[in-house]
Amino acid sequence: DDFLCAGGCL
């Protein structure tokens, strides 16, 4: 998971 995108980046 990516904390900058809450796991929702493309």
Curated annotation (Swiss-Prot):
It comes from the Eukaryota. GO terms for biological process: defense response to fungus; defense response to Gram-negative bacterium; killing of cells of another organism. The keyword Ribosomal protein does not apply. Has antifungal activity against M.arachidicola with an IC(50) of 1.3 uM, but not against F.oxysporum. Has antibacterial activity against the Gram-negative bacterium P.fluorescens. No antibacterial activity against the Gram-positive bacteria B.subtilis, B.cereus and B.megaterium, or against the Gram-negative bacterium E.coli. Has antiproliferative activity towards L1210 leukemia cells with an IC(50) of 8.33 uM, but lacks antiproliferative activity towards HepG2 hepatoma cells. Lacks mitogenic towards murine splenocytes. The keyword Cell membrane does not apply. This is Alliumin. Keywords: Antibiotic, Antimicrobial, Fungicide.
